[in-house]
Amino acid sequence: MAEHDYHEDYGLNSFNDSSQEEHQDFLQFRKVFLPCMYLVVFVCGLVGNSLVLVISIFYHKLQSLTDVFLVNLPLADLVFVCTLPFWAYAGIHEWIFGQVMCKTLLGVYTINFYTSMLILTCITVDRFIVVVKATKAYNQQAKRMTWGKVICLLIWVISLLVSLPQIIYGNVFNLDKLICGYHDKEISTVVLATQMTLGFFLPLLAMIVCYSVIIKTLLHAGGFQKHRSLKIIFLVMAVFLLTQTPFNLVKLIRSTHWEYYAMTSFHYTIIVTEAIAYLRACLNPVLYAFVSLKFRKNFWKLVKDIGCLPYLGVSHQWKSSEDNSKTFSASHNVEATSMFQL
């Protein structure tokens, strides 16, 4: 996988504390576990993010800044998960797709990883502005929409620029088998620092600061939506911490304590936490789109239009609930967002 550089694979071949039998057991486990997890994330992420894109583009339309972000986020996650079948095959067998595909997929994988994390950060800041600066946000919706599109464009450009080391130095190497990665230790350090900063610490800091203020604001507000909004905030934070913290902690340990490369148990930890981290691509559609009542209503419209299920008379139910939600939002001069129009 893209996270596995030359040094990691070299470490697998230079263990000291593990027996040959334990090492072979680990290789067999990795050969089965990672491809299976990649395929699960691929299928779930493909379905979930495709649904979000289709509904956002053809049903929901771009009505707010949040909508702009909720088009770019599933797009990034969708392209990200589409690289996983290649890594799954390489995990079972070896890299057979050549050097050009190696560089291309490393670049695509990395660009969309950074884009997804930076957009999550922007969504967090946007929610902060909408709740804490509600009146100002409401009065400047058009300007915020324009800036949102510019910000999304900048995010894609920045993601491309910070992904250049993987694209330039990515190559195919022959260890026990052909692998796609990069073997320069200095490049690995730069890549790790960038991934930790943009892919973990930045969104984590934004969530801690913004959601702390949002929670304080909601606790002093009235309305029937307050408790549900708080639950969603805690759920978003919990999912991010549970899926991203273990793998980033392991990567940090891996970069500072090379002796762990000789421990087979540590490599189990690497691949398990890596698989957990990729679950974000499956969970983002649920956390950032399907929590919206309007989005769920549009989902049922899509289901009706493609004829998969009868509409079952749910239209009136969604309409009634949506009217209540709009009343709540309007009374607070709050722009409709995926978190607060529930």
Swiss-Prot record:
Q: Which organism was this protein described from?
A: Macaca nemestrina (Pig-tailed macaque)
Q: Which GO terms describe its cellular component?
A: external side of plasma membrane
Q: Which GO terms describe its molecular function?
A: C-C chemokine binding; C-C chemokine receptor activity; C-X-C chemokine receptor activity; coreceptor activity
Localisation: Cell membrane
Q: Which UniProt keywords apply?
A: Cell membrane, Disulfide bond, G-protein coupled receptor, Glycoprotein, Membrane, Receptor, Transducer, Transmembrane, Transmembrane helix
InterPro entries the record matches:
CCR1-9-like (IPR050119), Chemokine_CXCR6 (IPR002235), Chemokine_rcpt (IPR000355), GPCR_Rhodpsn (IPR000276), GPCR_Rhodpsn_7TM (IPR017452)
Q: Name the residues that span the membrane.
A: 33-59, 69-89, 104-125, 144-164, 188-215, 232-259, 276-293
Q: For side Extracellular, which residue ranges?
A: 1-32, 90-103, 165-187, 260-275
The UniProt entry's GO biological process terms, in alphabetical order, are: calcium-mediated signaling; cell chemotaxis; immune response; inflammatory response; positive regulation of cytosolic calcium ion concentration
**Membrane topology of this protein:** Multi-pass membrane protein
Please report the name of this protein according to its UniProt entry.
Answer: C-X-C chemokine receptor type 6
Q: Enumerate the Gene3D superfamilies for this protein.
A: Rhodopsin 7-helix transmembrane proteins (1.20.1070.10)
What lineage does the source organism belong to? Eukaryota, Metazoa, Chordata, Craniata, Vertebrata
Q: Which domain of life is it from?
A: Eukaryota
| Disulphide linkage map | C102-C180
Tell me its family: Belongs to the G-protein coupled receptor 1 family.
Purpose: Receptor for the C-X-C chemokine CXCL16. Used as a coreceptor by SIVs and by strains of HIV-2 and m-tropic HIV-1.
Segments on the Cytoplasmic face:
60-68, 126-143, 216-231, 294-342
Residues listed as glycosylation sites in the UniProt record: N16
